[in-house]
Amino acid sequence: MGKRIFLFILTNILVITTIGIVLSVISAATGVGSYIGADGRISMVALLVFSAVVGFVGSFMSLAMSRWMAKMMMGVRVLNPEKDSLTYDEQQLVDRVHRLSRAAGLSKMPEVGIYQSSEVNAFATGPSKRRSLVAVSTGLLHEMDDAAVEGVIAHEVAHVANGDMVTMTLLQGIVNTFVVFLSRIAAWIASRFVSREELVPIVHFIAVIVFQIIFSVLGSLVVFAYSRHREFHADRGGADLAGKDKMVHALRSLEAYTSRIKDDDQTAVATLKISGKRKASLFSTHPDLNERIRRLEAK
C-alpha cells in the first residue's frame, strides 16, 4: 500500500498545484471567482468555496489517474490470460488474485500486474472496486515462498475490498481544502509586506505555490497516519481471506527481509514498501511490523 499512497500524494500535489495556478490566472485575468476584494481584503467565504472546489476536484482527479499513474511510473505489465501467453508463475499469480478477490466478494476481478524490480513490494490501486489493480514486483515473487505471497496478495485485495482508496480520497480532499485555504491566507499576509504595489501580485502568486507545497507536505502527515491505521484493517482482512497463519507468516517474512538487507537499501524500503521499516515514523505509510504481528496474533 505504501507505494500506492506515495504515488497518490505526489499526483495530488501536482494536480492541486496545477489547478490552483490555472484558476488563479483565470481569476486575475477576468476577476471571476476572485476571493480578494477591490479593497485588498480576503472574502473568507469565497476563499473557502474556492479551496473546497480545488481540494476535492484535485483529490478525485488524482484518484481517477491512480491506476494509470501506477502503471506508467512503475512500469507495470498487466497480465491478461485471454490475450497473452503467460508463464506458469504469472498464471499462478493471476489465479491467486482472482481466487482471493472472489473470496472477498468483489464482483469484478482486479487487473493483475507485475513489474521488474529486485525490491520486495506489492500494491493495490484504482478509482473503485470495479477498476482496481493489484501489482507485485518480481523481487517479491523471488524472495518469498508461496504462503507469504498468498498473505501479501490477500492483504492487497483486502485494501480493494475495503474501498481504502476512495476513503483516502475523501480524506485527501479535506486536507487539500485546508492546504489551499491556509496557503492563500499565508500568501496574502506575505504580500502585505511588499512595499511596491506592482510587485504584490507576483509575490502573492509565488508565495501561494511555495506555501501550498509546504502545507501539502505537512498535510500528508495526516494521510500517512490514516494509512497506518488502515494497514491493521487490511491485515485482518488478509487473515480472513488467506488464513491468519499465512498473513502472520507474510509479515514475519517481511520482517526477516528488512533485517537482512543492507543499510543503504533501508531508505528505499522505509516509505514505499508494503513492509516499511520495522519501526514506524511520522512519514511511514505502515505501522511497526512487530505491532502488526502482535495485533494479528491476538485476533
From Swiss-Prot:
Main location: membrane
Gene3D superfamilies: Metalloproteases ('zincins'), catalytic domain (3.30.2010.10)
Membrane-spanning residues: 5-25, 44-64, 170-190, 205-225
Subcellular location: Cell membrane
Family matches, as InterPro entries: HtpX_protease, Pept_M48_protease_HtpX, Peptidase_M48
Entry binding sites for Zn(2+): 155, 159, 231
EC number: 3.4.24.-
Cofactors required: Zn(2+)
Signal peptide start and end residues: none
A GO molecular-function descriptor: metalloendopeptidase activity
GO terms under cellular component: plasma membrane
Matches recorded under NCBIfam families: PRK05457.1
Protein name: Protease HtpX homolog
Gene that encodes it: htpX
